[in-house]
Regions:
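Anionic ligand-binding catalytic core segments
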Residues: 1-101
Length: 101
């Protein structure tokens, strides 16, 4: 198993919602397949396999909308707070294209 992490909360260990994820401006494929044969970066594919992760399509759609909104509203500010120059932010912008559509 790769790219998994856990968070200890008051009621025990929980799967981290995100771990070892790095934006890649020119990326169009994941390191690992999402299903048995597709490594495409695709929201539709993620929603398609949600039931296999015991997440309803309705809940997965709501989660995706929440993540996209959070990224859209915060990535530039957080990048600046971390010291990324304006030109570096522009270089990285394509990595966030799904959230910016």
């Amino acid at each position: 198993m790769r790219n998994h992490g856990f968070i200890l909360k008051g009621d025990g260990w929980h799967l981290s919602p995100l771990y070892d994820v790095n934006p890649v401006p020119e990326g169009d494929e994941l390191s690992l397949c999402v299903n048995e044969d597709d490594a495409t970066i695709s929201l539709d594919l993620a929603l398609e396999i949600a039931p296999y992760c015991e997440i309803s399509t309705k809940d997965a759609t709501a989660m995706a909308a929440d993540v996209l909104k959070t990224v859209r509203e915060n990535w530039n500010r957080l990048a600046a707070e971390c010291g990324l120059s304006r030109s570096a932010q522009e270089y990285m912008r394509p990595a966030f294209s799904l959230a910016l559509e």
